[in-house]
């Protein structure tokens, strides 16, 4: 269990970096559909 890559597991890094990316893409598409992102 302690023989992971460094001190932080790789799946935890992927989760913490994946959620904001998916959230940003979701907000971007939501803005495009609602008309807020059409001016970008």
Swiss-Prot record:
PSII is composed of 1 copy each of membrane proteins PsbA, PsbB, PsbC, PsbD, PsbE, PsbF, PsbH, PsbI, PsbJ, PsbK, PsbL, PsbM, PsbT, PsbX, PsbY, PsbZ, Psb30/Ycf12, at least 3 peripheral proteins of the oxygen-evolving complex and a large number of cofactors. It forms dimeric complexes. SUPFAM superfamilies: Photosystem II reaction center protein J, PsbJ. It is a single-pass membrane protein. Keywords: Chloroplast, Membrane, Photosynthesis, Photosystem II, Plastid, Reaction center, Thylakoid, Transmembrane, Transmembrane helix. This is Photosystem II reaction center protein J. It is found in: Plastid, Chloroplast thylakoid membrane. Pfam families: PsbJ (PF01788). Belongs to the PsbJ family. It comes from Ceratophyllum demersum. It comes from the Eukaryota. The keyword Flavoprotein does not apply. One of the components of the core complex of photosystem II (PSII). PSII is a light-driven water:plastoquinone oxidoreductase that uses light energy to abstract electrons from H(2)O, generating O(2) and a proton gradient subsequently used for ATP formation. It consists of a core antenna complex that captures photons, and an electron transfer chain that converts photonic excitation into a charge separation. GO terms for biological process: photosynthesis. Signal peptide: none annotated. The chain crosses the membrane at residues 8-28. The keyword Thylakoid applies. GO terms for cellular component: chloroplast thylakoid membrane; photosystem II reaction center.
């Amino acid at each position: 269990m302690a023989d992971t890559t460094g001190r932080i597991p790789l799946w935890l890094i992927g989760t913490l970096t994946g959620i904001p990316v998916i959230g940003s893409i979701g907000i971007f598409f939501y803005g495009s559909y609602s008309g807020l992102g059409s001016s970008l």
